[in-house]
């Protein structure tokens, strides 16, 4: 099966390698390959003969208007090129709870992306993932003010990127869902707890201060904001945060 993965970062590179190991013709591409999803540059040639396209692209800017423009234009150009090429399955990676936190401009843009995919005329699957363990250091840095990390105690249900890749590969190689599937880690944990456990392993000396008003993706969280929806039948990954911390390279 020929599969084109748009986005060659943390998930895209792993996904392509996983698919190749399983015997598929899979390639992860980014701007360094002459691809620009916001303009359509390079898409037609890239999609020749492809059966599946996976959109893992992300906006280079976090400004609300820029993020919305990125996901809107990228999705429009990708779907148009896929329709022309006869692609039979369009897969995107979205975020668990994106539709429950409208105060976040980034998440509003992800919802707009989902809606465009649903109306795009290509059979599709939307995989909503919880936050990745790998992004906890970035969350800590974003919440640091004068050497103190401000982190909410509201829960996420984060997941190892390798587990996301394993389940994403099953979706990519299966029939289109024409719907949404959610994936998350095995346990809900407060953002402050995630950072403290990370620092206990890495020896980071920064104080972690619990702050219920600390922002996350531009909004305040409640415990139910970014966890799997009740009754969603979310797939729960096997890797715990503590196991991931123990195994992560230093």
Predicted regions and their residues:
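NAD(P)H-binding glycine-rich loop region in Rossmannoid oxidoreductase-like domains
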Residues: 17, 21-85, 96-102
């Amino acid at each position: 099966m020929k599969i084109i993965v748009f986005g060659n970062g943390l998930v895209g590179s792993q996904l392509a390698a996983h698919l190749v190991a399983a015997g598929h013709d899979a390639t992860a591409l980014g701007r360094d390959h002459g691809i620009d999803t916001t303009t359509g540059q390079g898409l037609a040639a890239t999609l020749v003969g492809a059966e599946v396209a996976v959109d893992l692209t992300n906006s280079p800017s976090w400004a609300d208007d820029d993020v919305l423009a990125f996901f809107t234009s990228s999705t429009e150009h990708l779907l148009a090129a896929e329709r022309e090429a006869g692609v039979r399955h369009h897969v995107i990676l979205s975020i668990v709870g994106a539709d429950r936190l409208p105060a976040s401009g980034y998440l509003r843009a992800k919802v707009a992306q989902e809606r465009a995919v649903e109306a795009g005329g290509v059979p599709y699957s939307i995989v909503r993932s919880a936050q990745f363990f790998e992004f906890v250091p970035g969350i800590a840095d974003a919440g640091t003010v004068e050497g103190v990390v401000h982190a909410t105690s509201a829960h996420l249900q984060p997941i190892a990127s390798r587990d996301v890749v394993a389940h994403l590969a099953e979706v990519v190689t299966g029939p289109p869902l024409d719907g949404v599937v959610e994936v998350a880690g095995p346990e809900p944990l407060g953002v402050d707890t995630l950072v403290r456990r990370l620092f206990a392993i890495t020896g980071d000396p920064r104080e972690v201060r619990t702050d219920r008003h600390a922002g996350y993706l531009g909004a305040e969280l409640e415990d139910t904001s970014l966890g799997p929806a009740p009754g969603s039948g979310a797939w729960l990954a096997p890797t715990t945060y503590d196991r991931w911390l123990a195994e992560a390279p230093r």
